[in-house]
UniProtKB/Swiss-Prot annotation:
Broadest EC class assigned to this enzyme: hydrolase
Motif (DEAD box): 272-275
Quaternary structure and interacting proteins, as annotated: Interacts with the U3 snoRNA and is associated with the 90S and 40S pre-ribosomes.
The name this protein goes by in its record: ATP-dependent RNA helicase ROK1
The entry's keywords: ATP-binding, Helicase, Hydrolase, Nucleotide-binding, Nucleus, Ribosome biogenesis, RNA-binding, rRNA processing
Start and end residues of each stretch annotated as Disordered: 511-547
GO CC annotation, single: small-subunit processome
Pfam families (alphabetical): DEAD, Helicase_C
Main location: nucleus
């Protein structure tokens, strides 16, 4: 439905005289049911991320209930009960499993009831939060974790990885919570690279924990943010009251060093976005975290991309028999994302291209635009604000509260275009993103996959456009390789580019291209300014010489 059609709906004027009676309607309120229906339609069209609750009339609720009752009975939930059925399932979803004695995947969440005696409250919470059918990574990882196996899991962005580890984590801890010899304190630890992702994981886990555990003693997750860390440090709260801790590496290491957090009861540690956590920037902190964990605990790693170097490190911390689950290609993007490369020539050409997209109606909200630096994000924000586009920005220079506010406004549809750096590229789930634009070519395949993974999530279709210039002749090969592995069409002349050497990959990742300033000003105007400055310098020098 076109929102502008809804807003501009009019009336048909009758010319047989009967319209006079209808004119009296101008003096009265519109019929409530009709007005409610229009309001609901408009609200739905502007609620990009489906965050608002519809205000249904009683009549509408009754009608929908009647339709539900008329639906045919659903078929029984699927169950995978033999190795042969598992092979068919894995071939269908391009699942590759490495390791001995891998358990059968589940066919449905109901399958967990018979196989693992799933906690009834957990199943109810899944249904309440509209998790009806497990995704391929959930089908494989849930039974693997419930069997106590260490796990390295790689699945496309938007494929449900958070629930893939949250469901078995809550189920395992829920059963222990009700036992007589249950330990007090943090029993599961989830580590994520960014505050935003950690907060999102906490919300997902919290929604699953409702009612799980003994009566009046539910599982208690905590988000180790600044506020919670201060309370722990000051003794206002004890870590013993929590069962699950969700945190970023630096915050956790700080709490471990000052003694405010104890991991002595830990049974499970989960590294989300493991490819980022096992890079050099986080390596020392991850080592400190692992050193604080009891020996022999269960370890799991999840990510959308797992390079060979990261996998090698991951294997070194695992038990002797970890399972490795790969959904699709470990360096490919989700199949639901249509990828496109646009040659812009130079920096001025990028501005022209994005403004042309705006004029032609291609910036269908909501849209995310990625840039390589904070300064460039700020500059593009100023340009698009001047163009009258409903845009905002988010980057590392902003406070956590300000970033959270911008994210909320974007989720609620108050902001249509969001400009950001890679701070938003990992894990943040905006389910309704229509378009991702890489204004600057990303510096690695992992960065590209995570950026465009903000769209095409949970089975929805999305688009990703990457601008590149003549300065990106080498960098663009990173994008081309991912596009090929994802089955996307690549122009012939780009297909013929020589493959990247390891040295080139390292240079691209560690040395960002020095790009010209983002500005509307024409080169001629810049030259005039330059000449004026030179003339001013000359005049000052002449004046100084005369003195």
């Amino acid at each position: 439905m076109d929102i502008f059609k809804v807003l501009s709906r009019g009336a048909t004027i009758q010319r047989n005289g009967k319209h006079r009676k209808d004119l009296t309607l101008l003096n009265h309120a519109a019929p409530k049911d009709t007005q409610d229906n229009v309001d609901i339609e408009v609200a739905r069209e502007t609620d990009f991320f489906k965050t608002k609750t519809d205000t249904y009339s009683k009549k509408r609720v009754a009608e929908e209930a009647e339709l539900d009752n008329e639906e045919e009975e659903e078929a029984p939930p699927p169950i995978i009960s033999t190795p042969e059925e598992a092979v068919v399932f894995r071939n269908k979803h391009k699942i590759n499993i490495t390791g001995e004695d891998s358990p059968l995947p589940i066919g449905s969440f109901e399958d967990l009831i018979t196989r693992f005696n799933l906690h009834p409250y957990l199943l109810a919470n899944l249904k309440k939060n509209k998790y009806t059918d497990p995704t391929p990574i959930q089908c494989e990882s849930i039974p693997t974790m419930l069997n106590g196996r260490d796990l390295i899991a790689c699945a496309p962005t938007g494929s449900g990885k958070t629930m893939a580890y949250s469901i078995p984590m809550v189920e395992m801890l829920g059963k222990k919570k009700g036992s007589k010899d249950a330990k007090k304190g943090i029993k599961a630890l989830v580590v994520a690279p960014t505050k935003e992702l950690a907060s999102q994981i906490f919300n997902a886990v919290f929604s699953l924990c409702v009612g799980v555990g003994k009566k009046k003693d539910e599982l208690k997750p905590c988000l180790l943010d600044k506020s919670t860390a201060d309370k722990l440090r000051n003794g206002k709260v004890s870590s013993q009251k929590y069962d699950i801790c969700i945190t970023t590496p630096l915050r956790l290491v700080s709490a471990l060093n000052d003694g405010s957090l104890d991991l002595g009861s830990l049974d499970l540690v989960i590294f989300d976005e493991a490819d980022k956590l096992f890079e050099k920037g986080f390596a020392t902190q991850v080592d400190d975290i692992l050193a604080a964990c009891p020996s022999g605990i269960q370890k799991t790693l999840f990510s959308a991309t797992i390079p060979a170097s990261v996998e090698q490190l991951a294997n070194s911390i695992m038990s002797t028999d970890p399972l490795r689950i790969i959904i699709g290609n470990k360096q490919a993007a989700a199949q639901t994302v249509e990828q496109k490369l646009v040659y812009a020539g130079n920096e001025e050409g990028k501005l022209v291209a994005i403004r042309q997209m705006a004029r032609e109606g291609q910036l269908v909200a909501p849209v995310i635009i990625f840039l390589q630096s904070i300064d460039r994000a700020k500059a593009l924000f100023k340009e698009l604000v001047f163009d009258g586009i409903n845009v905002d920005q988010i980057h590392g220079d902003m406070t956590a509260a300000k970033r959270a506010s911008v994210i909320d406004r974007f989720r609620n549809g108050e902001v249509w275009v969001l400009i950001c750096t890679d701070v938003l590229a990992r894990g943040i789930d905006f389910r309704g993103i229509n378009l991702v634009i890489n204004y600057d070519v990303p510096q690695s395949a992992q960065s590209y996959v995570h950026r465009i993974g903000r769209t095409g999530r949970a089975g929805r279709l999305g688009k990703a456009v990457t601008f590149f210039t003549k300065e990106d002749a080498t960098n663009v090969k990173v994008v081309v390789n991912v596009m090929k592995q994802s089955g996307q069409e690549v122009p012939d002349w780009l297909n013929n580019l020589a493959p990247l050497t390891q040295k080139e990959r390292d240079n691209i990742k560690n040395r960002p291209i020095k790009r010209k300033k983002i500005s509307t000003q024409h080169a001629l105007a810049n030259n005039k300014k330059k000449r004026a400055k030179q003339q001013m310098k000359g005049l000052k020098k002449m004046k100084k010489d005369d003195e």
